[in-house]
Amino acid sequence: MVRLVPMTETEFEAHLEKSIPEYAAENVAAGYWSEEEALERSRKAFANLLPQGVKSENNYLFRIQLEENGEKIGMIWMKHEVPRPHGFIYDFALDETQRGKGYGKQAMLALEEFAKELDLKTIGLHVFANNTAAMKLYKGLGYEVTSQNMTKKLV
């Protein structure tokens, strides 16, 4: 079993160090950003979303840890989209060695319980089309596609 524990400032800084280049690379791969601008755009996106860092209002950043030994195996970040009773998952990552063991599903279910405690009625998220494992997880948990972006490369 896993549990969600609020992220510390140190964990948040480590998360940013890893997530900013990952988010930049995902947007380059999806064709949204050029490589030249990607890192700066990613930095700005995180700064805008989390102006007070880990203490940013209505944002909930958790480390995912195993209950039996306290090992940190990932993280998840949800924002309450005030004033709506809606949460949005901005980031969710499990260590590669911990994938395929049911921990992702457990973490998502734990986050759903937390969202219910906040009296949220819905949770949304974005997933890149090439992340088929994540899409399978989300669909299995009852998430539905509400919109899609489509791109055609012109040669």
Predicted segment positions?
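Acetyl-CoA-dependent GNAT
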Residues: 3-91, 95-97, 114, 145-154
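Alpha-helical elements of the RecA-like P-loop NTPase motor core of helicases
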Residues: 13, 135-136
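Conserved beta-strand-loop-alpha-helix junction that forms the acyl-donor binding cleft
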Residues: 99, 125-134, 151-155
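Conserved acetyl-CoA pyrophosphate-binding loop and the N-cap/start of the following alpha-helix
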Residues: 98, 102-110
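Conserved GNAT acetyl-CoA-binding A-motif
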Residues: 87, 108, 116-126, 149
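Conserved active-site tyrosine of GNAT-family acetyltransferases
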Residues: 138, 143
